[in-house]
């Protein structure tokens, strides 16, 4: 089927089934063919605003003006709003819409006042974007109070503050937020308003209609396939998506989100010389039972989420629904995550024998490439995937965290990442890595890659087994050059014949001791800090490091790059790196190939990367009696709950010290760690006096520990302890000294006060009140560590092993700073 030049409308999804096989859809020679899932809108300028009238029933959420995506009206225009805390009750006595920890947030009143003035219908049009470490939830607004309390229409996947003490937010789609060039707003009556960009004449405006462009619908379980179909020379543009009434969240990498083009049971499908652009979700997804797929020389850009998705996140066994043998070659995948920021350039789930070759993937808010989909060591059919000669760059932009240019999960024997150029990666709070072996990554080879200008390590392994990192160049990472997070009882990785050059930050992280368990092989590497400045090796001298068995054949020397200040990492012929067996490679071949015009498209200038923008939580102010938390749920804003059995820490509806609900902890002899069950809060108190209070009741035999920490590492420890008290065998003690009797089966009231920051004296005051008794005061009790300066962590820990229960109620954490 040959298309003449022109624009063709896709008003509804085109479905191709097995009987539609054996067809090529192509543009005529030299013809510009656009297949659009959108509709053009005509309007006019008035008083500096472009306006148009649309059918009020058409509630679109994307707009493209003169070929560029316009920004839906939002606040703030740059950066984020910080959530100020976790309310326990909806505003104005409204009915709950779910767990308070997933439906209520507080913001500064200045941002909430405009929302509180909206009608109920207008409020539900507002999207509240809540950012977590590696994804974002898109909530609809139910209620807003002038004091800053927000209530959402329903709960989504994750509790607020569950991954970090801060909660980045944006408010989107209300008239008062329309205040910057390039923004637009669609009113309930269909009035569309757009503020032109500087110097812009509005001539071409499109909004989306079709939710998907094409679906290839085979049935691999029945051996029925859509096959031998080619799309060549076609431009697919404009795809719709609408936020559900209850909001939307799709997890890490937006894994469950649909694509504009989707395929199940597809064989021998080719997309060549095509454009896939202006989507609200993912571009293309070869999901279940697909193989022998080719995407070649396609321009995939301006995406709501991901570019290419391969395989299925739920099909973890080999069989008819397993996807394999997908080739993505000489393809540009750029500017994604515009609606769902966790979208990835190219995502391989449970798939095998797939190749990404000579691609340019850049300008995403999360990882460029992700391979594997199991957290741990459970075998899956993910194997023998290859990423080679790809340019992976401009990632993160300080929006999300815990990402890499290439991110891997789980066992995947035969997977190789080679010859790639990874650079310009900046995260929101942590984890802007280059090469990232996350949970359970096993059997992966990384070789001949150039990694530079990342916010965190050029290489990071969370935990994994038997990975090989060889013959790579790591240059000028910002915080840590090479990071290892979690030691285990087998060889984690071999790190050899690599060049590591830096000018700032540490050479090795996460904590120094992780490098001295004998479970990493490190040898024949070259290290250099610019200017010959001294540096340590995980807290050790060069001799101490080598005496442990590391780097016995390695060198400290200038590698003699040709011009690293200009981005030229070619080695000079006399480079000492050759003496360690390093094999020079041509990093310049990474990226797309062919004519200069094609390479020029890939070379888009995205501007300087945003680094080091560390979100800082406002000081925590908590008063939680658990009355707003559902029975059986975890405490809101709490971290570190017992993952294997969340019921070990849960809210119950009986026996409370005050009100009807309290928090129950259940200890026992068979828990994984001695400190379980436990939970903690992240207060972010840096100065002044912190006050913590709680009621506690313990069964006989329950051991209970309350501790404050500064999370700044020491040489031999990952944190610094301050106030620490223990309830054990009917007594309250601190620092090994008994302070008072603490009888079981009654509610005890505890208060802890301490100065932190500049005015600290490394002591705390403690008050214990028994039922019907007078408060017992204990003053100037010493901190467990004199090095504690700030309060990052307040924990409730169960170090015992007896089968017993403990209850907590009315937890208060607050801080005052003298003016």
Placement of each model-derived feature along the sequence:
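Flexible glycan-contacting loops in extracellular carbohydrate-active proteins
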Residues: 776-807
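Extracellular polysaccharide-degrading/modifying enzymes targeting complex plant/algal/animal polysaccharides
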Residues: 1-275, 316-320, 550-557, 566-617
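Secretory/extracellular carbohydrate-interaction modules
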Residues: 656-729
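Solvent-exposed strand-to-loop "edge" motifs in beta-rich extracellular domains
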Residues: 236, 527, 628, 685-687, ...
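Carbohydrate-binding surfaces in secreted/extracellular proteins
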Residues: 626, 694, 744, 749-781
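Glycine- and acidic/polar-rich repeat regions and solenoidal domains
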Residues: 13, 241-263, 277, 281-287, ...
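Extracellular glycan-recognition surfaces and repeat-rich motifs
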Residues: 630-664
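Short, aromatic/His-centered strand-loop micro-motif at the edge of beta-sheets
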Residues: 731-751
């Amino acid at each position: 089927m040959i298309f003449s030049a022109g624009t063709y409308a896709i008003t509804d999804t085109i479905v191709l089934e097995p009987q539609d096989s054996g067809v090529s859809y192509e543009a005529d020679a030299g013809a510009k063919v656009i297949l659009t899932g959108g509709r053009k809108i005509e309007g006019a300028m008035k008083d500096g605003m472009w306006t148009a009238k649309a059918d009020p029933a058409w509630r679109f959420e994307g707009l493209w003006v003169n070929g560029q995506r316009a920004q839906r009206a939002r606040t703030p225009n740059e950066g984020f709003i910080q959530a100020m805390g976790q309310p326990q009750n909806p505003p104005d006595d409204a009915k709950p819409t779910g767990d308070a920890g997933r439906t209520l947030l507080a913001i500064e009143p200045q941002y909430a006042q405009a929302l509180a003035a909206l009608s109920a219908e207008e409020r539900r049009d507002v999207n509240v974007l809540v950012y977590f470490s590696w994804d974002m939830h898109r909530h609809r607004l139910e209620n807003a109070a002038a004091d800053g309390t927000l209530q959402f229409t329903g709960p989504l996947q994750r509790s607020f503050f569950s991954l970090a003490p801060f909660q980045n937010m944006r408010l989107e789609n209300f008239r008062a937020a329309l205040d910057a060039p390039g923004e637009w707003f669609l009113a309930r009556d269909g009035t569309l308003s757009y503020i032109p960009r500087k110097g812009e004449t509005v001539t071409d405006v499109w909004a989306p209609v079709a939710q998907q462009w094409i679906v290839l619908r085979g049935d691999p379980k029945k051996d029925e396939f859509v096959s031998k179909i080619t799309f060549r020379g076609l431009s697919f543009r404009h795809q719709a998506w609408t936020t559900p009434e209850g909001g939307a969240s799709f997890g890490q990498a937006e894994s469950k989100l649909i694509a504009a083009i989707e395929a199940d049971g597809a064989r021998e499908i080719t997309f060549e010389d095509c454009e896939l652009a202006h989507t609200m979700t993912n571009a293309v997804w070869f999901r279940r039972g697909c193989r022998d797929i080719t995407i070649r020389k396609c321009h995939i850009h301006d995406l709501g989420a991901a570019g290419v998705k391969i395989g299925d996140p739920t099909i973890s066994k080999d069989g008819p629904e397993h996807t394999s043998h997908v080739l993505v070659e000489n393809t540009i995948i750029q500017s994604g995550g515009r609606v769902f920021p966790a979208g990835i350039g190219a995502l391989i789930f449970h798939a095998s024998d797939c190749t990404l070759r000579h691609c340019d993937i850049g300008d995403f808010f999360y990882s460029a490439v992700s391979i594997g989909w199991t957290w741990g060591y459970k075998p899956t059919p993910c194997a023998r995937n290859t990423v080679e000669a790809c340019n992976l760059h401009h990632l993160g932009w300080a929006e999300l965290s815990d990402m890499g240019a290439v991110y891997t999960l789980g066992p995947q024997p035969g997977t190789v990442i080679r010859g790639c150029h990874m650079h310009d990666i900046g995260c929101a709070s942590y984890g802007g890595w280059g090469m990232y072996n996350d949970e359970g990554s096993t059997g992966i080879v990384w070789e001949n890659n150039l990694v530079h200008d990342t916010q965190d390590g050029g290489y990071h392994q969370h935990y994994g087994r038997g990975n090989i990192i060889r013959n790579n160049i790591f240059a000028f990472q910002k915080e840590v050059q090479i990071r290892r997070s979690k030691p285990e009882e087998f060889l984690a990785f071999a790190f050899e014949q690599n060049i590591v050059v830096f000018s700032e930050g540490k050479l090795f992280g996460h904590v120094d001791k992780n490098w001295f368990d004998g479970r990493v092989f490190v040898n024949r590497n070259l290290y250099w800090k610019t200017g010959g400045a001294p540096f340590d090796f995980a807290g050790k001298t060069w001799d101490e490091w080598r005496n442990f068995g590391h780097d016995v054949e390695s060198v400290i020397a200038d590698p003699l790059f040709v011009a690293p200040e200009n981005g030229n990492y070619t080695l000079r012929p006399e480079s000492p790196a050759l003496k360690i067996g390093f094999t020079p490679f041509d990093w310049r071949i990474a990226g797309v190939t062919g004519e200069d015009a094609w390479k020029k498209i890939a070379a888009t200038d995205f501007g300087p990367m945003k680094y080091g923008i560390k979100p800082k939580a406002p000081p925590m102010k908590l008063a939680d009696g658990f009355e707003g938390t559902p029975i059986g749920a975890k405490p809101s804003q709490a971290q570190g709950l017992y993952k294997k059995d969340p019921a070990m820490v849960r809210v119950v509806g009986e026996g409370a010290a005050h009100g009807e609900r309290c928090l129950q902890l259940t200890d026992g002899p068979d828990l994984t760690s001695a400190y379980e069950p436990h939970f903690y809060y992240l207060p972010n108190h840096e100065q002044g006096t912190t006050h913590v209070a709680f009621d506690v009741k313990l069964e006989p035999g329950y051991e209970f520990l309350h501790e404050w920490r500064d999370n700044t590492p020491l040489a031999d420890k990952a944190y610094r302890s301050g106030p620490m008290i223990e309830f054990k065998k009917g007594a309250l003690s601190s620092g090994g000294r008994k302070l008072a009797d603490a009888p079981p089966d009654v509610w005890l009231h505890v208060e802890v006060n301490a100065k932190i920051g500049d005015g600290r004296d490394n002591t705390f005051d403690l008050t214990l009140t028994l039922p019907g008794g007078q408060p017992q005061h204990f003053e100037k009790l010493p901190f467990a560590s004199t090095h504690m300066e700030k309060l990052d962590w307040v924990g409730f820990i169960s170090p015992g092993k007896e089968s017993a229960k403990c209850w907590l109620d009315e937890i208060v954490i607050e801080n005052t700073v003298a003016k």
